[in-house]
């Protein structure tokens, strides 16, 4: 996918150099919400090597939002899920404190939606936690519909589940 500049933020595919910055943003979010518990992405084995994980298969993608000075502001991706057919999971949408007021989450989500559609997926699935209330509001504004907890949930500590047709 080509780079896409939206105001002063560029959304682009992940590089290996982004890995430590993304891992720090993700861990910081879990620490701020006191969710450093098993059953969350905080303990995902690929967290320090997201570039390798998302580039391992052609129907995955991961994107970073970068400010004018090159600072990584946020991240979001998608990968296959066994929860539903022809469905990708929107994964690891996290923002730095500086990005939370710039609508970066919306921009990343929309980029991921288009990339998942381009990869042939028909639906996006999200699992999140009720403590991530700003993310829940964003998902609902983007048209995701809350569903009951499906079978095969990857992160057992999550308590909110959503679907959106692409």
Q: What do the predicted segments below correspond to?
A:
Residues 4, 9, 13-91, 96-97, ...:
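Acetyl-CoA-dependent GNAT
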Residues 32, 122-166:
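C-terminal "cap" of GNAT-fold acetyltransferases
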Residues 34, 38, 62, 102, ...:
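Short linear functional motifs in flexible/disordered or boundary regions
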Residues 37, 65, 85, 105, ...:
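Residue-level detector of alpha-helical recognition elements and their boundaries
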Residues 71, 88, 96-110, 117-119, ...:
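Conserved glycine-rich acetyl-CoA-binding loop
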